[in-house]
A protein has these predicted regions:
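Canonical alpha-helical transmembrane segments
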Residues: 54-58, 79-94
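Loop-to-helix transition at the N-terminal end of transmembrane alpha-helices
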Residues: 64-80
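Long, highly hydrophobic alpha-helical transmembrane signal-anchor segments
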Residues: 47-69
Length: 197
């Protein structure tokens, strides 16, 4: 019985070692990053199209601050659809001959972009709350409703983007150890470059 347990343990160790090696290959990492970027861009596009559709339908029937809420959703998501469309066009084809350096650079550049976007998202949400607060002090009802509707929309859209960008940041950040293992396979010395397999 002890031999069976030891054998199972040995097999599991070998399998996990093979998996650890296979998930640190450059093609695997490139493919995984490509899929993550494509999926997140498709999610943004889906969110935007859904908002455009729902707010487009609701705008004709809305009044008061609801009218302005749907109007701002339309403005906001026209931009989001454009961003998602450009992103999807850029992701039509995976880079067939990446270098370790280019993959690492792209990985960390994307993380920095997501953190910058997170800062912008916080600014959007804050601006939305400012508009909501401003709506309470407006003298005319039309301006009050406009600020309220626009503020609600900016809070909703900024809140979505905040969750979206932070989630993407943490997903991409979780790939950093895999990249580090890949980099650990390469070492430089005065005599040349050594690659471990």
């Amino acid at each position: 019985m002890k031999n069976v347990i030891a054998s199972i343990g040995l097999i599991m160790a070998i399998v996990s070692s093979i998996q650890a090696q296979s998930d640190t290959t450059l093609p695997y990492i490139v493919q995984k990053q490509f899929k993550l970027q494509r999926t997140s861009t498709q999610i943004l596009a889906g969110w935007s199209v859904a908002n455009l559709t729902l707010s487009g339908i609701a705008l004709g029937q809305a009044n008061g601050s609801n009218k302005y809420f749907h109007e701002m959703n339309l403005y906001w998501n026209v931009i989001n659809v454009g961003i998602a469309g450009i992103g999807l066009l850029g992701l039509r084809k995976i880079n067939e001959s990446p270098t370790v350096s280019s993959v690492v650079k792209e990985h960390y550049t994307l993380q920095k972009s997501l953190l910058l976007n997170t800062g912008l998202d916080i600014a959007y949400v804050t601006s939305g709350f400012w508009l909501l607060d401003k709506s309470k002090t407006e003298i005319t009802q039309v301006r009050s409703e406009r600020f309220r509707g626009f503020g609600q929309a900016v809070v909703v859209q900024g809140g979505f983007l905040l969750v979206f960008d932070l989630t993407n940041y943490f997903i991409h950040r979780s790939d950093s150890p895999r990249l580090h293992r890949l980099l650990d396979q390469v070492s430089l010395s005065g005599n040349g470059v050594r690659v471990k397999f």
